[in-house]
Amino acid sequence: MRKPRGGKDGLVKHQPGAPVRMKDIARDMGLSTVTISKVLRGHSDISEETRKRVLKRMEELHYQPNLAARALITGRTSTIGLVVPDLLHPFFAQIAKAVSAGIRGQGYSLIITSSEEDPDLERQEIEQLLARRVDVMLIASAQWSVESFRRIEERGIPYILIDRFFVGLASNFVGVDDEAVGMIATNHLIDQGCLEIAHIRGPETSTALGRLEGYKRALAARRLAPMPKHIVSIGSSGDDRGEPGGYEATKKLLGAKPRPDGIFCFNDPIALGAMRAILDAGLRIPEDIAVVGCGNLLYSDFLRVPLTSVDQDSEAIGKFAADLALSLVAAKTPPPPTSLMVSPKLMIRASSMRN
């Protein structure tokens, strides 16, 4: 090992006020700049002892990597782009938090944008991320077609679809088994004695289609026929996607004959609107109508009627997406597309407990 050189503290003297450079760290510790660089990039051929020593010394000297210079040398920006349809939705916020935690320790930063469920805005955000030369993109897409993803592929940027996929598009995907979500929720309502089960479905995405299919399969398996008037769609933009959409959809269902005695909602915000409509109509939850949502949002336990919900494990989705993104960056050649499915879990609360 090289002997440390420099001033009394071992650090090579440099102009006062100037930032500490990688080669200063290397000379200070008697290591090569290649070793320091490998530590910064998380290379596996560096021992854990050396990695900890280097990182500790960097922290002591307040070393900040020159990301622009590194990008010119490596062709990488150490950034990952995340496009979600709704920044305020807790499900996507929790995914973003888990992704950020998963990549932070490897020296990567997360750039988050929102499409507001607008395909045109999503395309603009993707173009902005391409212009920023992110190393990987994670996308919970609002698109109706795969054209935007062809554009990403042409640029040679790896991407991962989160929560929503496209049939016929060979891509990386991390999400929940949405058909299982629909089956778990519907079977639970049947087990609670519900026979007229309605479904408030989401917009035309793989997520909504999967949950609708699971709802239908669960009914068919128990020899119950889904009634068209018991399947109500919410709007695809604006407030229609959340509580207001759930409220209006439930008002329609309350006028149906026969009236539903159980409602499976596409997500928890819709379920909140559904419960408000039921209570405003002077009906009881779950005695008159049982309600199940999806997402298991943090406030579900603290509602006037605690909400039964299917937990999608957003933290696991974010962690898996982060790990997959880092592996795509490290790969010397593009690997075959990977699909990771998280198993949903039912969290039973008062809104559905009739037995």
Which residues are covered by each model-predicted region?
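Bacterial carbohydrate/catabolite-sensing allosteric modules
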Residues: 1-15, 60, 101-106, 130, ...
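Amphipathic helical "hinge" segments at domain boundaries
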Residues: 48, 61-136, 216, 227
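Short beta->alpha connector loops
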Residues: 116-119, 140-145, 269
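Acidic, Gly/Pro-rich loop/turn segments at junctions of secondary structure
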Residues: 136-148, 161-171
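Short beta-strand segments enriched in small/hydrophobic residues
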Residues: 28, 33-38, 73-88, 188, ...
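Short beta-strand scaffold positions
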Residues: 26, 139, 262-266
